[in-house]
């Protein structure tokens, strides 16, 4: 069953599959959708990441902790997790959202991740939800440092490469879909460290480039 593949990707098997199915349902598709779950999941995510940062950085002040948390729970970061799980393939969207490429939109993807967090919480409790969050965020948490959170992914990638006297990243717009007020950009990014080409998607060229850069940083564990 297709939903089994998703459960393997997120690392959790639901006792009550209805929670997961609701988490995957966008408001454009049904009255019983993931909006309330997204609200709850947002709170759970902020708590879990806040606790992790508090324990990992005993010397960091409140402002540094807040900035690091904001970086980890922002829409861009959640959308990257969503793409790692291929959530767009499993989401239930209305006809209009499907036509406009809603399954690629960062806001919809990030909301779905938060809804899944809430679904796990309702299915198995806070400990299990926190466990999954920490597993998904392991690399990002390990590499997070006070001060780095204020720098965007493109800046961090550029500084990483410059520090090793490597060529700067090459970005290229591959595709633009949608009307002027509702466009989806697809951008490629390549660096000499990898033969792979990384693809970023966003609602602007800048966001797409940031998305691609963040994927490279995850690959570099930086």
Curated annotation (Swiss-Prot):
PROSITE patterns: DS_RBD, RNASE_3_1, RNASE_3_2. Keywords: Cytoplasm, Endonuclease, Hydrolase, Magnesium, Metal-binding, mRNA processing, Nuclease, RNA-binding, rRNA processing, rRNA-binding, tRNA processing. Residues 152-222 form the DRBM domain. Its main location: cytoplasm. Pfam families: dsrm, Ribonucleas_3_3. It catalyses: Endonucleolytic cleavage to 5'-phosphomonoester. One of its GO terms (molecular function) is ribonuclease III activity. One of its GO terms (biological process) is mRNA processing. The keyword Cytoplasm applies. Its cofactor is Mg(2+). It is found in: Cytoplasm. Residues 3-125 form the RNase III domain. InterPro entries: dsRBD_dom, RNase_III, RNase_III_dom, RNase_III_sf. The active site is at 42, 114. Its EC number is 3.1.26.3. Coiled coil: none annotated. Mg(2+) binds at residues 38, 111, 114. Digests double-stranded RNA. Involved in the processing of primary rRNA transcript to yield the immediate precursors to the large and small rRNAs (23S and 16S). Processes some mRNAs, and tRNAs when they are encoded in the rRNA operon. Processes pre-crRNA and tracrRNA of type II CRISPR loci if present in the organism. PANTHER family: RIBONUCLEASE 3, RIBONUCLEASE III. Homodimer. Belongs to the ribonuclease III family. HAMAP family: RNase_III. This is Ribonuclease 3. It comes from Haemophilus ducreyi (strain 35000HP / ATCC 700724). The lineage of its organism: Bacteria, Pseudomonadati, Pseudomonadota, Gammaproteobacteria, Pasteurellales. The gene is rnc.
């Amino acid at each position: 069953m297709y939903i089994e593949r998703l459960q393997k990707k997120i690392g959790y098997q639901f006792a009550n599959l209805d929670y997961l199915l609701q988490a995957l349902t966008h408001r454009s598709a049904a009255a019983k959708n993931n909006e309330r779950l997204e609200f709850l999941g947002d709170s759970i995510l902020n708590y879990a990441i806040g606790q992790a940062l508090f324990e990992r950085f005993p010397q960091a002040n409140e402002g540094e902790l807040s900035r690091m948390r904001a970086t980890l729970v922002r829409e861009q970061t959640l959308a990257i997790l969503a793409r790692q799980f291929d959530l767009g393939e499993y989401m239930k969207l209305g006809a209009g959202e499907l036509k406009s490429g809603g399954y690629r939109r960062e806001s919809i993807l990030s909301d779905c991740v938060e809804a899944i967090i809430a679904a796990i919480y309702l299915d198995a409790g806070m400990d299990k939800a926190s466990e999954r969050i920490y597993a998904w965020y392991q690399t990002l948490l390990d590499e997070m440092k006070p001060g780095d959170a204020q720098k965007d992914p493109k800046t961090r990638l550029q500084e990483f490469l410059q520090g090793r006297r490597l060529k700067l990243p090459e970005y290229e717009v591959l595709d633009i879909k949608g009307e002027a007020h509702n466009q989806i950009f697809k951008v490629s990014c390549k660096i000499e460290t990898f033969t792979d080409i990384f693809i970023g998607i966003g609602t602007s060229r800048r966001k797409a480039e940031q998305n691609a850069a963040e994927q490279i940083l995850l690959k570099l564990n930086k």
